[in-house]
Amino acid sequence: MARLAGHRKFHGIADVEIKYRQRYLDLMANEDTRAAFLKRSQAMGTLRRVLQEKGYLEVETPMLQVQAGGAAARPFITHHNALDMDLFLRIAPELYLKRLLVGGFEKVFEVNRNFRNEGLSPRHNPEFTMLEAYEAYADGEAMIRLTEDLIGAMCQAACAGTKISYQGRALDLTPPFKRLPMRQAVVELGGIADPDNLGEADLARLLPDLSPAQRKALNAGQRLEALFGEHVEPKLWEPVFITDYPIEISPLAKRKGDNPALADRFELFIVGRELANGFSELNDPLDQYQRFADQLTAREGGDEEAHRMDEDFVTALMHGMPPAGGLGLGMDRLIMLLTDAASIRDVILFPHMRPQASPSRPAEGPAGASGQAFVATQGPKA
C-alpha cells in the first residue's frame, strides 16, 4: 500500500490532539519532537551507565502483583483466569527490590513502568517510567548524593550543561541542591507560623479544597503534608530537597534517631513538582508490621491510597534486611525539564488520551498527486 504522505511534505503539526494521538505524524513532521526523544534516549542511557559504574545491578521485578505495595496510590486491577484471582498492575517495585537486598544483592536498580489508576494532567500519565535504586549499608544521605549525581550527569548528556531554561525561565540544576525541613518550609515559605496548632477555622481557610470531614480525618502528618502541598510546593522553582517528613506519611522509612516522630526521608522538588523520593529504609520487621497495620486501619476508614498489609514482605524482613538507602526518581518529569516540555505527553511517545467521540478517519481521503498530507478528524480535547 502506498504511503499517505512523504516525510518531507510535512512542516509541523499545530494541532496538539493529532500530535499525541498520531505520534507517527508528529515524528514525521516535527524535528523538535524527534530531537526531544533522542535527548530522552541519551539521558536514559547515561542514567544506566552511571548506576552500573557505581556497581548497581539492573534487575526486573513483577509487573503483576498480588499486593499493590510500595507507594500510596490507587492501582489498576486485573484478573488471572487460570488462577481465578485478582492481580494488580504495580504501583511501585519497592518491596520486591528490598527482597533482593534480603537475598544478598547489595546494590540494585530498576528502570521500568509503574501504573496508577488516577487522573490525567500535564504532570500525570497512568503509566510512567520510574527509576528505583537500593543500596545496602547506605542511608538517606547517600541517596541524596546519588540523586544529585544522576541528575547532573543526565543534564550534561542531554543539555551539555546544568544551567538550562525551562518554559522561558532560568533553571540551575548544578549540584549540590538546597535542603529544607518540611515544617520549616511550611513556616518560612508558606507563612504559617504554627502549623501544629491550627483550629478548624484556620484549616478551612488554609485548605479550602477539603471538606470538613476530610480535614477532620487528617492526622498530624497528613495535615502538615496538605499545608505543604497547598502553600509551599508551587513556590519551589529551583531544586530543593525537602527533608524530615512526618512518620505518619512515611510507612516504609526508618525513623530519625534524634526524633522518632520524623522519618529519615527526603523528596526533591523542581519547578513546583516532586521528582524524587528517598529515605533510609525501614528494616525492623516489628515496626514495619505495625506501620502496615496503621495503614490498614486508615484504609478501613476510607483512605483508598493507604498501603496494604504485606505479610510476605514482613516475613522477608524477619530473615534480615541490612540497613539500606532507597531512591525513586521520576524519569518523565525529569525529561520534561531537560527537553523544555510543558506537558508529560510531550516526553511519552504514546501518551494515554481520553477516547475520541468517533473513530479517526481521513478528512479528504488519502493524499493525491498534489502531495496533500493526510489529516485525521479531531476529537474532543483530552
Tell where the protein language model's regions lie, with residue ranges:
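Class II aminoacyl-tRNA synthetase catalytic cores and aaRS-like
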Residues: 1-382
